[in-house]
Amino acid sequence: MSKQEAVSELTKQQAQAELTPLREQLKKWGAEYYEQDNPSVEDYVYDRAYQRLVEIEQRFPDLVVPDSPTQRVGGAAESQLNKVTHEIPMLSMGDVFSLAELADFNRRQQDNSDVKVDFDYNLELKIDGLSLSLVYENGRLVQGSTRGNGTIGEDVTENVKTIKSIPQVLPEPLSLEFRGECYMPKEAFVKLNERREAEGQPVFANPRNAAAGSLRQLDPKVTAARQLDTFMYYVPDYQALGVTTQAQALEKMRALGFAVNPNYRVVHSQAELTAYIEEYTKKRDQLPYGIDGIVEKVNDLATQVALGNTVKVPRWEIAYKFPPEEQATVVRDIEWTVGRTGNVTPTAVMDPVQLAGTTVSRASLHNPDYLVEKDIRLGDTVLLHKAGDIIPEISRVIIEKRPADSKPYEVPTTCPECGADLVHLDDEVALRCVNPMCPAQIKEGLAHFASRNAMNIDGLGPKIIEQLWDKGMVKDVADLYRLEAAQLLTLPKFGEKSISNLLTAIANSRHNSCERLLFGLGIRHVGAKVAQLLAAEFKSVDALMAADAATISAVDSIGPIIGDAVATYFQNEQVHQLIAELKEVGVNMDYLAPTTSATESAEWAGKRVVLTGKLTKMTRGQAQEWLSARGASVTGSVSKKTDLLIAGEKAGSKLEKAQTLGIEVWDEDRFDQAMKEEN
């Protein structure tokens, strides 16, 4: 933002001229954040602009209009999800950006209020997620909803039932609403983006966007796979809990089975308040979840009620927002890389700087539109921060330091690897190379084909694939099975033992069950789990190739998006040719039930099994691997086709549905005993 006149210096005419574009800009940013889960600016940019709007309207109250962002909460609930009306509005929160502003807020609250306010505040970490309401009747979860515009939110009941930290049934028959924050842990966010990138899908900008997009899914199975978590922090009807302070309310919620952030603290002085903020300003990078500030609440709940709310925010709480940690550096180059699906992504290469505990020299520029909107040029000095405390990102260009001979960066129109024209597909912001013979895509595809979850060819990594490609030894995955020892001897640092091990690994991969092949082919939207489901259902690649989109979509846990993608892939004549070549070199095309004894096969082969709840004697992954190895198909949802549900601790809606459908249910002890008997 260019240098602006101080609000105190504005004339009414100047204020009026500034207000309209400022409000429109804030509405646009608000819609991106609340409705599209895809903000184009960082929180602090929005916060500063919003703060200026507040100050102008406070100075000229007659210029306030009903649709100003200061008069509304959040954004509209604009999705295909059902709408929920909040009986008690879910308000926004006021914020301050310095310790001085926070001290001033407290002083005004204590001195100017008709209500006596003691220096008795509960401090809580401000979790970077989205607000969530949970309604219980007689102790049972009956509704989950997002904040939306504060009055009307979205019904996400079935989705919240998939979140492990949310109890389905309370230990007391309470009929109450509980509020909190839904978030995505940092580790889950990184893994989700790695998965999406591997499958050619756009990655999320930060954990908050990922959490919002995951919670607002139409399909609860998608939400379940995203590893969301929650921290609850508020009960509108606190008297029903028998508590008198915010700290007591948090402990009561913990006793009821909710996840409550343990890092809250009651403070009684400005020194204690400052110490807490300074402590978590330093610790925030080490936390397994994102925080973007500290929330200060009047600890006494009766005082909270007496203070009440403005039209938009409570008077009894305020958020202290962390200043963004930024470092200035210089952009030296912009590299363009081609992914397995042809997506061409720009990356800024910069002078190394220390940022949030790590050395950073590269930052993704996401897509060409982002690069153009930010007007990033070679030689520019830029401010760098970590989005969601994780991903290095350029905040802005420091225009004053731009070289005099600077020129706008020209986005390439041809693929940096093969020279083919780059295109936008289906209104995507990404640029794609659609040349099926693009070397970069083929090499990425070869690496994916050989990866552990695909054909599992040990020893065949990207560097060796690069050498094989450069020597002209492979042009597609079928060529891997035509490699001979004499060819490999020409590669540097390749001895007889290495060659023998690699050829053995390649030969062994011929005999994989076909779900590994399906995943290895790199079909859009087909991860390892989907490949397993398709293989178990159709039994062979040929049968899957012959199926239409509707038939594939009807498979349990698949759906129309995946069904269309798979059917479209197998309609391609080049794919038919590749499958024929793979058959020619002896690659198995059938689903192979694991080699087991007659007793084992009778017990597990072909069974559809669902795992639910927390397992204590093994991880869910270990249980799934054991079952799959014995021919069982492990699915994510309960249906009439399910043969067995294995229920761990705190099993919820899946257990209820299985019991309703009359499906056999085992607890973990029985499953553990069955494993011991077979092993």
Swiss-Prot record:
Query: Where does the record place the BRCT domain?
Result: 599-679
Q: Does the keyword Zinc apply?
A: yes
User: Per UniProt, which keywords does this protein have?
Assistant: DNA damage, DNA repair, DNA replication, Ligase, Magnesium, Manganese, Metal-binding, NAD, Zinc
**Which catalysed reactions does the entry list for this protein?**
NAD(+) + (deoxyribonucleotide)n-3'-hydroxyl + 5'-phospho-(deoxyribonucleotide)m = (deoxyribonucleotide)n+m + AMP + beta-nicotinamide D-nucleotide
Q: Which GO terms describe its cellular component?
A: cytosol
Quote the EC number. Answer: 6.5.1.2
Q: Which GO biological process annotations does it have?
A: DNA repair; DNA replication
Instruction: Write down the superkingdom of origin.
Output: Bacteria
Q: Which SMART domains match?
A: BRCT, LIGANc
Under the heading SUPFAM superfamilies, the entry gives: BRCT domain, DNA ligase/mRNA capping enzyme, catalytic domain, Nucleic acid-binding proteins, RuvA domain 2-like
Q: Where does NAD(+) bind?
A: D43, Y44, V45, Y46, D47, S92, M93, E124, R147, E181, K297, K321
Catalytic residues at K126
Identify its protein family. Belongs to the NAD-dependent DNA ligase family. LigA subfamily.
The UniProt function text for this chain reads: DNA ligase that catalyzes the formation of phosphodiester linkages between 5'-phosphoryl and 3'-hydroxyl groups in double-stranded DNA using NAD as a coenzyme and as the energy source for the reaction. It is essential for DNA replication and repair of damaged DNA.
Q: Which HAMAP family match?
A: DNA_ligase_A (MF_01588)
Q: Under what name is this protein listed?
A: DNA ligase
List the source organism. Answer: Limosilactobacillus fermentum (strain NBRC 3956 / LMG 18251)
Q: According to the entry, what is the taxonomic lineage of the organism?
A: Bacteria, Bacillati, Bacillota, Bacilli, Lactobacillales
